[in-house]
């Protein structure tokens, strides 16, 4: 009986380790000089095929910059295209670049993923 219980606990813990249900965004914090390039990376939840990039400035609500489904850009109308670019080269990575950075780019940038 004790062996069967131990076996169940180990399998449950292993199963929990295999499911990593979170979006990873790097860097977590970035302070840069004006004019520098900033690259943000997003690793979506495994199995999610849609990635969203949002920005929230001090005086505004959350605004959608761009989103991708199956690596293809579906809407990037919220992104200033003169200095911003976004891409999703594969199913495990999306990037948002700002070049050159300006003081008005100071904001919190969010990445989210979905099905």
Curated annotation (Swiss-Prot):
SMART domains associated with the record: IGv (SM00406)
Highest taxon in the source lineage: Eukaryota
Domain Ig-like: 22-115
GO cellular component, one term: plasma membrane
Keyword entries, A-Z: Adaptive immunity, Cell membrane, Disulfide bond, Immunity, Immunoglobulin domain, Membrane, Receptor, Signal, T cell receptor
Compartments where found: Cell membrane
Gene3D superfamilies: Immunoglobulins
Protein's name in the database: T cell receptor beta variable 12-5
Phylogenetic placement of the source organism: Eukaryota, Metazoa, Chordata, Craniata, Vertebrata
């Amino acid at each position: 009986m004790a062996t069967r219980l131990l076996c169940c606990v180990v399998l449950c813990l292993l199963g929990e380790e295999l499911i990593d249900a979170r979006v990873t965004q790097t860097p977590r914090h970035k302070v840069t000089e004006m004019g520098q390039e900033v690259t943000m990376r997003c690793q979506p939840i495994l199995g999610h095929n849609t990635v969203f990039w949002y920005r929230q400035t001090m005086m505004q609500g959350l605004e959608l910059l761009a989103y991708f489904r199956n690596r293809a850009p579906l809407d990037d109308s919220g992104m200033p295209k003169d200095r911003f670019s976004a891409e999703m080269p594969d199913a495990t990575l999306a990037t948002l670049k700002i070049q050159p950075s300006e003081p008005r780019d100071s904001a919190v940038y969010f990445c989210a993923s979905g099905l």
